[in-house]
């Protein structure tokens, strides 16, 4: 079967068809079961992180090395010519002359598409502002499939910061292709953006607003937690909402046996450590799947056949 992702930029989940997502998913599962160390042999990958990252940067760089490739790059935009005023377009032009692909994280929405416009090699978006995080979405899909045995018509609850959380935006855009049903739990000021709910309406996917994490845990197959960021509230308002969106083990008492709790990490207070010991916790395994998801992206973008 032809590889539908060869030499393609990976910028946004909305750019990818269900066929392409399924190809990525199955390749990630295949590489997890049967690792290969030759798929990036002779390839040099640019790792360009203009803002801090732990899991995304290290898992991408791990993926490159496990596939037999090499990495050059930076982990802080302050140490690059961007500090001198070089445009992102020029940076992309230059680095694409050195490398076979560029992995980029940037604080500005839309930065990945700018880089892709001027790069001579594929650009993989490792997060651009509050916009998109497609490689996180792929590892989420791998994890959901791994725990549920399917993606079709699952019940997906999302909690916390749904307005600024790029992970939940991308995940909704992916899972709508499988006819999933959604539930949202958040402060009103951090509700899921209208453009996402409009996309769900257009896809015929039902969604509901729930008032508590207990309701979400009882209803869902997947409970996807995100961090409510203190810096978006004054202290008094934050104190009112903080505990309401923190999950502890007691809230899972009526959960279905197949429920799995996911989180893009890092967590702060929104998942109590007592959840870690429950059979529902799966966020550390989710993070591990990041390596295999990113191995799949790199392998497919840089090889005609995998």
UniProtKB/Swiss-Prot annotation:
The keyword Iron-sulfur is assigned to this record: no
Catalyzed chemical reaction(s): carbamoyl phosphate + L-aspartate = N-carbamoyl-L-aspartate + phosphate + H(+)
Keywords: Pyrimidine biosynthesis, Transferase
SUPFAM superfamilies noted in UniProt: Aspartate/ornithine carbamoyltransferase
Descriptive protein name: Aspartate carbamoyltransferase catalytic subunit
Enzyme class: transferase
GO MF term list: amino acid binding; aspartate carbamoyltransferase activity
Gene: pyrB
Role summary: Catalyzes the condensation of carbamoyl phosphate and aspartate to form carbamoyl aspartate and inorganic phosphate, the committed step in the de novo pyrimidine nucleotide biosynthesis pathway.
Family: Belongs to the aspartate/ornithine carbamoyltransferase superfamily. ATCase family.
Any one Gene Ontology BP term: 'de novo' UMP biosynthetic process
Chain sites annotated for binding L-aspartate: 84, 166, 227
InterPro entries on file: Asp/Orn_carbamoyltranf_P-bd, Asp/Orn_carbamoylTrfase, Asp/Orn_carbamoylTrfase_sf, Asp_carbamoyltransf, Asp_carbamoyltransf_Asp/Orn-bd
Keyword Lipid biosynthesis: no
Pfam families in the cross-refs: OTCace, OTCace_N
Enzyme Commission number, as recorded: 2.1.3.2
Pathway(s): Pyrimidine metabolism; UMP biosynthesis via de novo pathway; (S)-dihydroorotate from bicarbonate: step 2/3
Record-level GO cellular component terms: cytosol
Positions annotated to bind carbamoyl phosphate: 55-56, 105, 133, 136, 265-266
Quaternary assembly: Heterododecamer (2C3:3R2) of six catalytic PyrB chains organized as two trimers (C3), and six regulatory PyrI chains organized as three dimers (R2).
């Amino acid at each position: 079967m032809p590889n539908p992702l060869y030499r393609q930029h990976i910028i946004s989940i909305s750019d990818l068809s269900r066929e392409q997502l399924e190809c990525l998913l199955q390749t990630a599962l295949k590489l997890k079961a049967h690792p290969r160390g030759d798929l990036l042999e002779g390839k040099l990958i640019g790792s360009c992180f203009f803002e801090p990252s732990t899991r995304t940067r290290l898992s991408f760089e791990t993926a490159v090395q496990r596939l037999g490739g090499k990495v050059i790059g930076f982990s802080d935009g302050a140490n690059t010519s961007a500090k001198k005023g070089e445009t992102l377009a020029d940076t992309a032009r230059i680095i694409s002359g050195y490398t076979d692909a560029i992995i980029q994280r940037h604080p500005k929405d839309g930065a990945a598409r700018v880089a892709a416009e001027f790069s001579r090699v594929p650009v993989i978006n490792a997060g651009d502002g509050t916009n998109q995080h497609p490689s996180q979405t792929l590892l989420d899909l791998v994890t959901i499939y791994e725990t549920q045995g399917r993606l079709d018509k699952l019940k997906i609850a999302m909690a916390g910061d749904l307005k600024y959380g790029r992970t939940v935006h991308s995940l909704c855009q992916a899972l709508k292709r499988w006819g999933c049903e959604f539930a949202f739990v958040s402060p009103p000021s951090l509700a899921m953006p209208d453009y996402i709910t409009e996309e769900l309406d257009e896809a015929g996917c039902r969604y509901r607003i729930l008032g508590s994490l207990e309701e979400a845990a009882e209803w869902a197959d997947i409970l996807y937690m995100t961090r409510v960021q203190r810096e978006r509230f004054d202290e008094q308002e934050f104190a009112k909402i903080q505990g309401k969106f923190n999950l502890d083990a007691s809230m899972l008492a009526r959960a279905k046996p197949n429920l799995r709790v996911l989180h893009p990490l890092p967590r702060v207070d929104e998942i109590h450590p007592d959840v870690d010991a429950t059979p529902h916790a799966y966020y550390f395994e989710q993070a591990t799947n990041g390596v295999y998801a990113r191995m799949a992206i790199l392998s497919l973008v840089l090889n005609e056949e995998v």
